[in-house]
A protein has these predicted regions:
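Inter-lobe coupling linker of SF2 helicases/translocases
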Residues: 71-76, 82-89, 106-121, 126, ...
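Walker A/P-loop
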Residues: 1-4
Length: 322
């Protein structure tokens, strides 16, 4: 929303290209319609009209209709690059910009070309984690948003980094403050939750130990162990052995989840009895299905892999309005 507000105040910011993870595309389109209004030629707000938006979901090359916003996921960029280069884009927005931390990927090369177009006036990157473990991953991102700020990659590494035994460039500890100052001075607006949510209460964590059916778990673990020994005995390659271990690990995780399930259901019921909201995360579809079935009287929203975009969006909306 902050990005949309910024673009609405800038002159000649449209058309804008929004590049984002696949699961957030519909949300971008929804927020555009919710928060932005169309302006008339004389600059007046038109209450009943919104900026137009096109969501690009097909990898097949074809001309793209004119629009105020073009929304596409990172994975389709290189396939639709020729079509996107034809557009008169004025702004490039990269949501979860850490996707561009590797300068050798196809999506990085595509964004680099799009952001370097003569008509592009604004480049915006959004991320909660722009700097990863080594620190040097920030260079490709900054070189798209503000080319030349950190010099060439070689110059950046020579000044800010050392190279470890694996050949990876890592930002020196005594250079971190200097790099942070350079970024916040020229290109990075760092906002903490405490800065933007003044009225939000501090998060409080109460760890609760959930009981489990230990007898069931040990019986399942015994079956998994015997099956693993059998598979290892007849494994012909290192790949077969590795795959067998992975299957055993997944089976153990599911057994642990099933052993806790009745107690988790009781725990959720107790919370619901005092009319509090609950979010439950689970790893396996089988456990998800059992949870959903057992707690169906609360009509819970359910977000899980394999859902259609339409179904997932409907579930997200129902979750928001709970």
């Amino acid at each position: 929303v902050q990005t949309l507000a910024y673009l609405s105040k800038e002159k000649n910011a449209f058309p804008a290209l929004v590049i984002a993870p696949l699961v957030t595309l519909t949300n971008w389109q929804r927020e555009i319609e919710k928060f932005l209004k169309k302006k008339s030629r004389n600059g007046k707000i038109m209450e009943n009209k919104h900026p137009s938006s096109v969501m690009i979901r097909n990898g097949k090359q074809s001309d793209i209709d004119e629009s105020d916003f073009y929304i596409i996921n990172y994975e389709l960029l290189h396939k639709r690059l020729p079509d996107l280069l034809k557009l008169n884009i004025k702004t490039v927005v990269c949501d979860e910009v850490q996707h561009l931390r590797s300068k050798t990927t196809q999506k990085y090369a595509a964004v680099k070309k799009l952001a370097a177009k003569d008509g592009v006036k604004f480049r915006v990157g959004l991320s909660g984690t722009p700097i990863y473990n080594r620190g040097s991953e920030i260079w490709p991102i900054v070189d798209i948003l503000k080319p030349g700020l950190l010099g060439s990659y070689k110059e950046f590494c020579e000044y800010f980094c050392y190279v470890n035994e694996k050949g990876k460039a890592i930002v020196l500890e005594n250079k971190r403050d200097s790099l942070r100052n350079q970024l916040t001075k020229h290109v990075m607006l760092r906002r903490k939750k405490s800065d933007v949510l003044k009225e939000l209460k501090d998060k409080v964590r109460y760890p609760e130990v959930i009981a489990s059916d230990e007898k069931f778990y040990r019986a399942e673990l015994d079956k998994i162990w015997k099956k693993l020994e059998e598979e290892q005995k007849y494994a012909q390659t290192a790949f077969d052995k590795s795959a067998s271990y992975h299957r055993a690990i997944e089976s153990e995780r599911q057994a642990a989840g099933l052993a806790k399930l009745p107690h988790v259901i009781n725990f959720v019921n107790d919370i619901m009895d005092i009319e509090e909201s609950v979010v439950v995360f689970c790893h396996h579809r089988a456990i998800h299905d059992l949870l959903h079935q057992s707690l169906s009287k609360y009509n819970p929203a359910s977000i899980i892999g394999g859902q259609s975009d339409k179904r997932r969006d409907a579930e997200i909306l129902s979750l928001i309005h709970i």
